[in-house]
Regions:
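Phosphate/pyrophosphate-binding loop motifs in nucleotide- or prenyl diphosphate-using proteins
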Residues: 1-169
Length: 169
């Protein structure tokens, strides 16, 4: 019997919550940020793939799907690079916020980090597909870059954390 508190259920449940949040974020897109819609939909598809992979142990005969991260992660990294090169450089921490879309993307970022922690907890108990963890790790960085890009598109400036030292180079 698998309880709702089982680390496996927690891990794919966090992925499901994240997927719902990405869908909500898509509903907030403005005319300026509408260009993010297709990639956010693709991320939702990939999150379903990750959840599918996590839902059944690899050694279980019902495990019918394995997520492979190489191409999706390379795609995310290309988006991260593009958005980072487009927006003004920052050396300090920024406060999550700005436009509605950027704020929602920051929530997606922190939800992704929570999902990553749940996946690590599952990994400490049993073997998992490392490709899922790699993709989820890069996805949180994508959401940070996309949030900054959304603020840029909506002509909102990032707000620097006033007590931050230079942390980005």
């Amino acid at each position: 019997m698998l309880f709702r508190s089982d680390p496996r259920v927690e891990a794919y449940g966090e992925i499901d919550e994240l997927n719902s949040w990405v869908g909500y974020t898509r509903s907030l897109l403005t005319p300026q940020t509408a260009k993010l819609s297709n990639e956010l939909e693709e991320i939702q598809q990939l999150l379903f793939d990750c959840g599918h992979d996590l839902a059944t142990p690899a050694e279980d005969e019902r495990h019918s799907f394995e997520f492979h991260q190489k191409e999706p992660t390379a795609w995310l990294e290309q988006k991260i690079d593009t958005y980072t090169e487009t927006v003004p450089a920052v050396k300090k921490f920024i406060l999550p916020g700005g436009s509605q879309v950027a704020s929602a993307l920051h929530v997606a970022r922190t939800t992704t980090r929570r999902a990553e922690r749940r996946i690590v907890l599952l990994m400490q108990e049993e073997e998992i597909n490392q490709d899922v963890l790699t993709f989820i790790n890069r996805l949180s960085d994508y959401f940070f870059a996309a949030a900054r890009y959304a603020n840029y598109l909506d002509q909102q400036q990032d707000v620097l954390y006033r007590n931050s030292k230079d942390v980005f180079h």
